[in-house]
Amino acid sequence: MPKKLLLALSISILSVFSLNAQTVVGKYAGEFMALGVGGRALGMGGAFVAIANDVTAGYYNPAGLANLNYPQISLMHSEQFGNLVNYDYGAVAIPFGADLSFGISIMRLGVDGIPDTREALVDPSGTVVYDITDPRNRINPSLITEFSNQDWAFYLTFAKRHTDNFYWGANVKIIRRDIAEYSATGIGFDIGALYSPLDNLYLGANVQDVTTTLVAWNTGRNELVSPTLKIGAAYRIVEILGGYIMPAVDFDVRFENRRFASYGSLGPVSFDAHAGFEYNYNNLFSVRAGYNDVKQFTVGAGVKLPKLNLDYSFARFSESEIERLPDSHRISLILTLEEPRFMRDIF
């Protein structure tokens, strides 16, 4: 069986069977929101909590939207696992007054064309049956239909400049999940902060799903997305080879009992890390590299044009070529409406 079809069938089987279980679970319930956004940040291994100085801050650290002096728009598209999974992202942010910013971000993760064999098993007489243990029963290809699995997340972001070196912000998240005839909705909250204690040193923190996010399925099943604490630091080293280099590191603390799936764990608490750097030459182009929380090596590059930033990132798992999943390529753009009439009001 082709690898793509096998993966699609696995997703559908696991999803459908899990939806019928009337239990409350928390592990990996919000994993689709952990994929990261933006070619710039992803090229740095996702180490962006302390940087977060563009429109993608609505995802990485809501406080970072306070950095904006002009409105920004961002778009990203990615096809993962051999083009089986489509991942799209879009965001808009605007500065307001002297110290506020507002934004909206949308993420969609989708698998289309999943074979649905639930009504395709027939007995020797051609009657649809559901007994998979009877070796005489066979799949009738003409009865196989298709369905989609879609996960959506909508972020509404508020950010404020509290002082010149301290910003804070918050997200309201609305979640929508669909698989075949099943659907779920949820709402959650994030809070974040940015602090620069010294010139060129940046510290950040973001508590995702701070109140624990409830995702309720129409089957009666409820999933809880546990809080995740993300903390990070970045330092900008200026005047190197005509530009600057900025190393960054993030640490994720989760409370989902992930154990061996993480870099380290202590009881139900798990720890993951992101590390990366960016070299920017004269604010014209950038090169990046990093290592993320799912053990992928990442590289990337970016070009700054008038009012437009184009960024690309590449990620590869560290396993051997035979064992690892396909590579990921992501391209994103950021449009900055850098005109006097759109500039933040400075009183």
Residue ranges and their predicted role:
Residues 17-21:
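Sec/Tat signal peptide C-region and signal peptidase I cleavage site
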Residues 1-9:
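Bacterial N-terminal signal peptides that target proteins for export
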Residues 8-16:
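Bacterial N-terminal signal peptides
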Residues 22-347:
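Subset of outer-membrane beta-barrel
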